[in-house]
Amino acid sequence: GNQTEITVSFTPAEYDVLTYQGYFHYFDEQAMADPMVVDAGLDGSAKTMVNKFTARAIEELEKATLTAPAAAWSFDAVVDAIAKMNLESEDGLFLLISPADQAAFRKALKDDLKYSEGFVRTGYIGSVCGVPVIVTKAVPANKGYLATKDAVTVFIKKATEVEQDRDPNTRDNKFWIRKVAVVALTDATKAVKIHIGG
């Protein structure tokens, strides 16, 4: 028979279902003068929506309960953050940092990476302890987030929809692109907040 009983628990949390929307408009004359106007507008709207999703994901990572304070960015700071996760396998980890911290991180790692051709040529950080370092403006200065993709989940509630409207008198074309979703921290054990100077 069974020797142990496996139990599962969860903490209920309420989340807001949000609409992420991009909007742009152009006039027929603009599209005639430059056929890329529509493509650029659609691309800009899509990027706006992605940036909003990214900002929400960072807000959710901020709720993580595991923390790894560090005096400064260093190889040791990353090692300590990885240790907080207590993982058997470190596959799938990534580290998000701010562009404001990128220079300090490069300087701190210069002795560890000085023989890496990419670092010597471009200042490329790449990976630290096998963890890819991703620089994003969505992360505030002096903070970092070590995580796996399982930490935050995007629950799509409504597929992408596109609406358009055109005023025939002014030849003004309007586009709205939207997606309805919930962005939530779904596994707090898969994320560590790194506080620099704290």
Describe the predicted segments one by one.
Residues 1-3, 28-32, 109, 125:
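Short charge-dense sequence patches
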Residues 1-20:
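Assembly/oligomerization interface modules of large self-assembling protein complexes
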Residues 8-14, 108-198:
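Sequence/fold signature of self-assembling virion shell proteins
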Residues 15-22, 27-31, 52, 100, ...:
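Generic structural motif
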Residues 16-18, 89, 169:
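Solvent-exposed loop and beta-edge segments used for protein-protein assembly and interaction
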Residues 20-91, 193-198:
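Alpha-helical scaffold segments that mediate packing/assembly in large oligomeric complexes
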Residues 27-28, 96-101, 147-148, 187:
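Helix N-cap / beta->alpha transition motif
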Residues 61-131, 136-138:
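Extended, solvent-exposed, turn-rich assembly/linker loops in the middle of proteins
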